[in-house]
Swiss-Prot record:
Keyword Cytoplasm: yes
Name of the protein described by the UniProt record: Octanoyltransferase
General remark: In the reaction, the free carboxyl group of octanoic acid is attached via an amide linkage to the epsilon-amino group of a specific lysine residue of lipoyl domains of lipoate-dependent enzymes.
Biological function: Catalyzes the transfer of endogenously produced octanoic acid from octanoyl-acyl-carrier-protein onto the lipoyl domains of lipoate-dependent enzymes. Lipoyl-ACP can also act as a substrate although octanoyl-ACP is likely to be the physiological substrate.
Record-annotated BPL/LPL catalytic domain positions: 30-212
Annotated positions for site Lowers pKa of active site Cys: 138
Superkingdom to which the source organism belongs: Bacteria
Gene symbol of the encoding locus: lipB
InterPro entries: aa-tRNA-synth_II/BPL/LPL, BPL_LPL_catalytic, Octanoyltransferase, Octanoyltransferase_CS
BP-aspect Gene Ontology terms: protein modification process
């Protein structure tokens, strides 16, 4: 059985969840089910492993955390749906699925593209700049870390949030990159993380071919 466990964690501090992801990845074994963690974070900038300090344009009272995911600096805040994917890529390959790290990135991008399509919105990835875009504006950022063939970190999908803090950085290292969110395209009553997250999970589940799912609230 290829099971996917989905944990709904609510609003949690970034560093606490980050360290829990590291512990989970370090202590899992070949029988540990893959997991998705759905969470929102209080305001925080996170700097990826390739991050350059000059991409923080204006220091603020928002904390900056140096993390171990790929990529440059980004912002997390409430109203942004974060989906962390703790996936055993080695096991998927052993099951006959040709899944590389690039394939996992593509799967994450496609689950966002398909979720946007559910709302009648055309989103698309860029081959040279991971993430998902609408008319040149970025709505979803991606960053992964692979340790011993197992992934952690994931995607951050802007749903209904204050985008102002993004003005203090070059998002994902790109000067002048404009951010957007789902609320700009649909009714605010529909642009809610608890309505969007099941769509993200369902598309990810189908793209990677899981055949069982368990949902855990906190």
């Amino acid at each position: 059985m290829n099971q996917l466990i989905v944990r709904q964690l609510g609003v949690q501090p970034y560093e606490e969840i980050w360290h829990q992801m590291q512990d989970f990845t370090d202590n899992r074994n070949e029988n540990t089910a893959d997991e998705i963690w759905l969470v929102q974070h209080p305001s925080v900038f996170t700097q990826g492993s390739a991050g350059k300090p000059e991409h923080l344009l204006n220091p603020t009272n928002i904390p900056v955390v140096q993390t171990d995911r790929g990529g440059q600096i980004t912002y997390h805040g409430e109203g942004q749906q974060v989906m962390y994917v703790l996936i055993d890529i080695k096991r998927l390959k052993a099951q006959g699925k040709d899944v590389s790290v690039r394939d996992l990135v593509t799967a994450l991008e496609q689950c966002v593209v398909k979720t946007l399509a559910d709302y009648g919105i055309e989103g698309y990835p860029k081959p040279d700049a991971p993430g998902v875009y609408i008319n040149g504006k970025k709505i979803c950022s991606l960053g992964l870390r692979i340790r011993q063939g197992r992934s952690f970190h994931g995607l951050a999908f802007n749903v209904n949030m204050d985008l102002t803090p993004f003005r203090n950085i070059n998002p994902c290292g790109y000067a002048g990159l404009e951010m957007t969110q789902l609320k700009d395209y649909i009714a605010e009553s529909e642009a809610q993380c608890d309505l969007v997250s099941p769509k993200l999970v369902a598309h990810f589940y189908n793209i990677l071919g899981y055949n069982a799912q368990q949902i855990i609230n906190k």
